[in-house]
Amino acid sequence: MANLNQSEQKILAARTAVETLVQKGLIFSGMKIGLGTGSTALPAVKRLSEYIADGTLKDVKAVVTSFQTENACADWGVPVYSFKDRCICGELDLEIDGADEIDNDCNLIKGGGAALLREKIVAYNAKKFVVVADESKAVSSVGTKFPLPIEIIAEAYVPVKNKLEKMGAKCTLREGVRKCGP
């Protein structure tokens, strides 16, 4: 992948991951799949939509981690459901998502796109969790290139910030935009 730019690497990694998961039977007709958020997850969603459109996959039910992914699924014909829907029953067969950083021990940072809570809920309720990433996400130790996202409710902002700063953390408030929706 050395001759590809970062965007091309992400697309190749995502498409290859979905193709491999289909070939190995981990993505299959009738499954309930979690679909992640971000620049690597979206090409995976696009490839999944192509399998649905050509009839290779049928009756796939997706639960998404963000407004961004929900819109992409609508545009590309991937049926979206909620954990509240009876056909999902609060459990997914597999989730596929990207990451912000991954170290050699497979520790990772997620949630940098401001969809952390939904990403955690979907991952927790999936039997299998697949992370797709290009080489730019590889680090020797997580937290070296990307800040650790912490999602809190507005009412808890001041006390949580105070406690984190007492522990030596540098806190920066980031308001949800783009992937989180309006």
Please report, for each region that a protein language model flagged, where it lies by residue.
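Conserved phosphate- and dinucleotide-binding cores of soluble alpha/beta proteins
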Residues: 2-12, 51, 68-182
